[in-house]
Regions:
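Short beta-strand-centered interaction patches in the first periplasmic/extracellular domains
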Residues: 1-64
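An acidic/polar, Gly/Ser/Thr-rich interaction patch typically located in mid-to-C-terminal regions
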Residues: 36-238
Length: 238
């Protein structure tokens, strides 16, 4: 459908995978990892699901997303059959919150373009996509139909992929060869405060998709390092 642009082609130890981002987000979490500096027992199985260390690599790089046209863009395509261009109204693309499934519970809120303005950053295009439509070029016969109309997916797939990379975390955990790139995991990080508290940090805790991972084995121990990503903040999305 028109609302499902954004597919990923990648390889894991199980072979090649081709999946939509929405399908990956709707997966059940395969494991829950907790960051704690307490190591209760060397034989406690809970230590297998402990985050040894982590670092937040990216946390909403707004300027980069504006440069890539993530939230709003203008498309300009040329039809070589009738020598017409798409109109400004036809080529306008705007980020729609309701069309996007997300890992976090918090809505993506964009700032206003100025303190006095009512419009937000998704109301003004920040990138222009240009191209030539494929009309009868790659068809075996004679056709006047547009083949793989880029105006229906190019801007949306760019939006979907870049929104997915809103928050990126690198972390190290005890070795787990059952994990795969593309799996969803739940991560729990304690909220930093002066007082003793078991409260979780809502800004970085929640569900993530494993973007990449590798396993390391040596006589001192076995570890899995990974990079995880998600598109929004909060514990649970939908």
């Amino acid at each position: 459908g028109d609302k499902t642009a954004g597919f990923l082609f990648y390889q894991t130890q199980d072979g090649f995978q081709f999946r939509s981002i929405d399908d990956m987000i709707e997966q059940e979490s395969v494991a829950t990892y907790v960051y704690t500096e307490v190591n209760k027992s060397s034989v406690d199985r809970n230590n297998d699901f402990r985050i040894i260390k982590y670092s937040v690599d990216k946390n909403q790089d707004l300027l980069k997303k504006l440069r890539l046209g993530t939230y709003s863009s203008q498309q300009l395509f040329f039809n070589p059959l009738n020598f017409r261009f798409t109109t400004p109204e036809q080529g306008k693309f705007k980020f729609q919150k309701s069309d996007v499934k997300k890992l976090g519970a918090r809505e993506i809120e964009l700032p206003k373009i100025s303190d006095e303005a009512e419009r937000t950053l998704d109301d003004l295009p920040t990138r222009i996509f240009t191209g030539i439509l494929d009309v009868g070029t790659l068809d075996r016969g004679i056709s006047r139909n547009v083949n793989a109309d880029a105006s229906k997916y190019q801007a949306q797939s760019t939006m979907r992929y870049n929104v997915l990379l809103t928050q990126t975390i690198s972390m190290l955990i005890p070795c787990n060869t059952d994990l795969r790139a593309g799996n969803v995991i739940t991560c729990e990080f304690p909220k930093i405060s002066r007082e003793d508290s078991s409260e979780l940090d809502p800004d970085i805790s929640g569900k993530y998709i494993i973007k990449e991972l590798c396993h390391h084995f040596d006589p001192e121990g076995s570890y899995t390092s990974m990079k995880i990503v998600r598109d929004s903040f909060g514990f649970y999305g939908g």
